[in-house]
C-alpha cells in the first residue's frame, strides 16, 4: 500500500516531494500554495494579514466545526443530538458572519471555501438524520452553501452523495435479506 509508505496513518491525500512525505489535506493545500506560488488562482490571499485571517478560520473549522459535525452525527440520544446541533449552528453562524460573499473572501474561491466544501456536500446526511437545516444557521449561510455546492470545481471532486446512496441501497438490501 503506497499510502502507508508515504503517510504512516495510511490515509490520503499523501504526497512524496523531493524525498519527503507530506500529508493532511489542508497542510498539502498550503504546501502547494508555497511551493508553486506562480500557479493561479491562489487559494490564500496575498496580503499577510488576510492570509493569517484565512488560517484562523481554517483553525476554527478544524477545532470547532468539524468536531461538532462529528458529535452531531454520532450522538444517539435526543438530548445529545440537540446539544450537538446547537454547537454546530453556533460554529457555522460564527463563520457565516465573516463571509464576504459569494465566497468567503468575496469573489475569490479560497482555501477556507475549499476546507468547508466537503462538509457542505455532506450536510444532507445531517439534514436527513439529525434535523439540521442550512436556513436555521442563517440566510447568509444557506446562500453561501448553495453557491459553494454547485461550483464546478466542487461538483467535479465530490462523490459523497453517490457514495451514501450506494451505502443506503446496501443497508436496504441487508434489511430485506434478514
Go through each PLM region and give its residues:
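A contiguous, mid-protein "functional segment" used to position or interact
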Residues: 137-166
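GST-like domain detector, emphasizing the conserved glutathione-binding G-site
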Residues: 1-104, 178
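Alpha-helical scaffold segments in carbohydrate-active enzymes
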Residues: 53-56, 60, 91-94, 117-122, ...
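Acidic/histidine-enriched, glycine/proline-rich intrinsically disordered or flexible terminal extensions
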Residues: 160-178
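Surface-exposed helix-capping loop/turn segments at secondary-structure junctions
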Residues: 97-107, 128-129, 152-157
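GST superfamily/GST-like fold recognition
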Residues: 107-143, 148
Amino acid at each position: 500500500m503506497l499510502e502507508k509508505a508515504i503517510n504512516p496513518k495510511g490515509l490520503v491525500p499523501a504526497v512524496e516531494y523531493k524525498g519527503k512525505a507530506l500529508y493532511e489535506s489542508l497542510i498539502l493545500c498550503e504546501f502547494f500554495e508555497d511551493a508553486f506560488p506562480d500557479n493561479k488562482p491562489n487559494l490564500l490571499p496575498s496580503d499577510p494579514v488576510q492570509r493569517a485571517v484565512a488560517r484562523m478560520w481554517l483553525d476554527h473549522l478544524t477545532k470547532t466545526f468539524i468536531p461538532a459535525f462529528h458529535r452531531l452525527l454520532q450522538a444517539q440520544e435526543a438530548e445529545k443530538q440537540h446539544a450537538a446541533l446547537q454547537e454546530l449552528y453556533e460554529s457555522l453562524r460564527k463563520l457565516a458572519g465573516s463571509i464576504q460573499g459569494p465566497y468567503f473572501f468575496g469573489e475569490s474561491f479560497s482555501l477556507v471555501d475549499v476546507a468547508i466544501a466537503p462538509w457542505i456536500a455532506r450536510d444532507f446526511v445531517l439534514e436527513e438524520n439529525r434535523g439540521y437545516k442550512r436556513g436555521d444557521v442563517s440566510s447568509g449561510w444557506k446562500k453561501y452553501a448553495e453557491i459553494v455546492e454547485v461550483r464546478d470545481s466542487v461538483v467535479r471532486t465530490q462523490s459523497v452523495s453517490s457514495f451514501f446512496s450506494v451505502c443506503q441501497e446496501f443497508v436496504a438490501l441487508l434489511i430485506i435479506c434478514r
